[in-house]
Each structure stands twice: as C-alpha cells, then as structure tokens.
Swiss-Prot record:
It comes from the Bacteria. GO terms for molecular function: carbohydrate derivative binding; carbon-oxygen lyase activity; ether hydrolase activity. Its EC number is 4.2.1.126. Keywords: Carbohydrate metabolism, Lyase. It catalyses: N-acetyl-D-muramate 6-phosphate + H2O = N-acetyl-D-glucosamine 6-phosphate + (R)-lactate. Homodimer. GO terms for biological process: amino sugar catabolic process; N-acetylmuramic acid catabolic process; peptidoglycan turnover. PANTHER family: GLUCOKINASE REGULATORY PROTEIN. The gene is murQ. NCBIfam families: N-acetylmuramic acid 6-phosphate etherase, PRK05441.1, PRK12570.1. Residues 64-227 form the SIS domain. This is N-acetylmuramic acid 6-phosphate etherase. It is an enzyme of class 4 (lyase). Belongs to the GCKR-like family. MurNAc-6-P etherase subfamily.
Length: 310
C-alpha cells in the first residue's frame, strides 16, 4: 500500500462546526485588541447566515402561526447551548406577549438544572427526548423546533423523528451543510456560520445565529397572532414598574390619553394594554370592548376596523 493511501486513511473528517478557523490560529498569542478584532469580524457571519435562510424562516413562521391558531403549541428542544437558547426564547414569551406558559415551551436535556450545569452525557440518549415530549402531551397539533448545531445530536434527532411519526410539524435548526448532516424535516434551517473562533465552541457564531433566528421566529409568530400593534407590545404583562411605565407610554402614544387616564384604564382592564387601547380609541365600555376583542380573535387592528365600519 502506498504512503498516499496510508495518509488518506488517517485523515479525520471534521464537520464544519468542528473545523479549525485559520483566522484565529495561534489565538493564545494575540493581544487583547487583536482578540477583540477577531471576534468583531467573525460575528458578521451570523447575520449573513440568517440572511441566507430568509425563505426558510418565512415558511417556518407561517406554518407555526397556522398551527398555533389551530390550538397547537410550539416547542424548542436541544442540549447544552442549543437547549438553553430554546428555553430562553420560550421563557420570554409570557412577559413580552402575555402568552400562557404552555403555548411556547423550551425543553433541554436534563431539565432545568441543565441551564446552569452540564448534562452532556444525555445528548446521546434519544429515548429521553421522546419521554420529555410525552410528559408534555406533545401531539400532532404541535410544532417542534429541534436545535442542534452539529445536526447530529441523538437527543434532538430522536425528538424530531418521534414528532414526524405522529405528524407534528418538525423544524430543525443546525449550523452544518447537508454533506455533514442529512436532515429530513418539514423545514430545515441551516445557519452556516463556518468554523468557530474556538474550534468546536458552537456557543459562539452558531449560537449567535441561532438566537437571531429564534428572535425572528417567535416575534414574527406573535405579530401574526395579534400580539403587536404597529411596533408596540400591546399584550405585555404589566408585572413591574418598568412595564407599567411602558404600558402607560403605549396608551399615551397610541391612545392619546394622559398618564392619569392611562392608569385608570389599566386598573379597569386588570392591566390589559390591548383592551385599554380599544376603550381609549373607541369610547366603548369594558364589557363591550372585551366582547369585540373576542370576536376579533384578540386582534386590536381588526377590532378597530370593525368599530369604524359601524
């Protein structure tokens, strides 16, 4: 056997996220300024990666919205950084959009304790993911977004395969090309950010791109569900002084009411900015405004169009 053949047999194939980033080679010899500049330049890649998958994001948003309007729920599932990003995005939905905590849920291998401690040994156990979904009564009505930078994590792939088997909507988010991981879901979003500054540390560029994609997906879905008017969070949960000030500001800007009136409206509506706005803009009483909102499926703009039509 030739030396060439011997050499080729010893070559290790590394998936994209495990490859060496030549621009950050000898990183430990760099000055602080050089390190920061390397990071700054590398962090342009996540934005480019997101721009390349805009069609897939649009498809995902529309399909998720359709499922949620039909009493479905949205689940994120992942391990390590990927799991933490899913839990983070899900946990922001109730305070930002006043959603029921059951509507958008994040599942991380190992449960809540894995948010602060490593549970990497669970990444390779696909059966646990299936059990985690069954514990939440996951059904064909629901949506599963499996987050796996490598596109290979057994825990995530097991969850996606189970979801497909019961006809739930399945979406994957990975950071590798098809040659590194063959995924076959309803929608596969590949955020190609290239080798990491620290080889294999996908909490960096891959994680940043994933966070950007999740921001776009969840926020866009909530807009489609009527949780936003203009660019204002009209379904926010008024749970502290900062959010109370924000709610008053929204009523002042859109409803053209002063601070005293805004506070009175929020008291009447148990802190509902959306309902308070409808009352301020239409002159309706609480009961009639609430009924109109229900008839308009919670969409303030639709409700206001109906008021003008009458």
């Amino acid at each position: 056997m030739s030396d060439t053949n011997n050499h080729s047999k010893n070559i290790i194939h590394r998936i994209l996220t495990e490859q060496i980033n030549l621009t950050s080679n000898e990183l430990d010899t760099k000055s602080t300024k050089e390190i920061v500049n390397i990071f700054s330049e590398a962090d342009k890649e996540p934005q480019k990666a997101v721009e390349r998958v805009i069609p897939e994001l649009i498809n995902a948003i529309d399909e998720i919205t359709s499922r949620l309007k039909s009493n479905g729920r949205l689940f994120y599932i992942g391990t390590g950084t990927s799991g933490r990003l899913g839990v983070l995005d899900a946990s922001e939905c109730p305070p930002t959009f006043c959603t029921n905590p059951d509507l958008v849920q994040g599942i991380i291998a190992g449960g809540i304790s894995s948010l602060t401690t490593s549970s990497e040994h669970l990444e390779d156990v696909s059966e646990i993911a299936i059990s985690d979904l069954k514990d939440r009564n996951f059904s064909y009505r629901d949506v599963l977004i499996g987050i796996t930078a490598s596109g290979r994590t057994p825990y995530v792939l097991g969850a996606l395969n189970y979801s497909k088997s019961i006809s739930a909507l399945t979406i994957s988010i990975s950071s590798v090309p098809e040659r590194d991981s063959t995924l076959d879901n309803d929608i596969d979003i590949r955020l190609i950010t290239g080798p990491e500054i620290l080889a294999g540390s996908t909490r960096l560029k891959a994680g940043t791109a994933t966070k950007m994609a999740l921001n776009i997906i969840s926020t866009s879905v909530m807009i489609k569900l009527g949780k936003v008017y203009g660019n204002r969070m009209i379904d926010l949960s008024v749970s502290n002084d900062k959010l109370l000030d924000r709610a008053i500001g929204i009523l002042f800007d859109i409803g053209s009411v002063d601070k005293v009136t805004a506070v009175q409206l929020l008291k009447k509506t148990n802190g509902s900015v959306k309902l308070s706005l409808l009352i301020a803009l239409s002159g309706m009483d609480v009961i009639d405004a609430k009924q109109l909102l229900n008839d308009s499926k919670g969409n303030l703009r639709t409700a206001l169009i109906r008021v003008k039509g009458n």
